[in-house]
Amino acid sequence: MTKVLFITANPNSAEGSFGMAVGEAFIEAYKNEHPQDEVVTIDLFNTTVPAIDADVFAAWGKFAAGEGFETLTEAQQQKVAAMNTNLETFMNADRYVFVTPMWNFSYPPVVKAYLDNVAIAGKTFKYTENGPVGLLEGKKALHIQATGGVYSEGAYAAVDFGRNHLKTVLGFVGVNDTEYIAVEGMNANPEKAQEIKEAAIANARELAKRF
């Protein structure tokens, strides 16, 4: 059975978000096409996603020195445990669907924090004599991103840092089979917003058949 993580990073629901509407349309179609698969929703705004901070570095330092989990402070234990949960869930999945908005040329900070939780040496990638090697080969990912302007092509494509960063991190951990759906231009062309949304939903439903 294939396990799919539906990873969202938007405080708004599908009623208030173009990206979430497309994301939910995709996952509904995916479930219809693949009823045997398991879909797990991870709402990053309602999930504990520790940032790498002094507590985390201190905990890693203790582990490197051979000290056990019991030697950590309560705060360190809570953060490390949450990070380990996020990491294990990510490693045990086969497909990833990220749904994010663009905020000032990138995605919400919680997405970066989540990627810091799952891009871990010795777990999702390893160092070799020839450089780092991803350990999650054979998995697939989809990124659905909503942007007010047009960033998938043209002059602004270079500043689509969220899309580029996510693709880079996924490739780094071995997930090189990636798809992308742009839900874009709604603010630049408000009179076409509904048309843009409907076209993206149709694209998402079609992709769900072969994802």
Curated annotation (Swiss-Prot):
Cofactor: FMN
Catalytic reaction(s) noted: 2 a quinone + NADH + H(+) = 2 a 1,4-benzosemiquinone + NAD(+); N,N-dimethyl-1,4-phenylenediamine + anthranilate + 2 NAD(+) = 2-(4-dimethylaminophenyl)diazenylbenzoate + 2 NADH + 2 H(+)
InterPro entries linked: Flavodoxin_fold, Flavoprotein-like_sf, FMN-dep_NADH:Q_OxRdtase_AzoR1, NADH:quinone_OxRdtase_FMN_depd
Short name of any one Pfam family annotated for the protein: Flavodoxin_2
Enzyme Commission number(s) from the entry: 1.6.5.-, 1.7.1.17
Organism domain of life: Bacteria
Entry GO MF terms: electron transfer activity; FMN binding; oxidoreductase activity, acting on NAD(P)H as acceptor; oxidoreductase activity, acting on NAD(P)H, quinone or similar compound as acceptor
Record has Mitochondrion as a keyword: no
Cofactor stoichiometry and binding remark: Binds 1 FMN per subunit.
Binding locations of FMN: 102-105
Keywords of the record: Flavoprotein, FMN, NAD, Oxidoreductase
Key word NAD present: yes
SUPFAM superfamilies xref list: Flavoproteins
UniProt function note: Quinone reductase that provides resistance to thiol-specific stress caused by electrophilic quinones.
Entry's family note: Belongs to the azoreductase type 1 family.
Subunit description: Homodimer.
NCBIfam families hit by this protein: PRK13556.1 (NF010075)
UniProt name for this protein: FMN-dependent NADH:quinone oxidoreductase 3
Underlying gene: azoR3
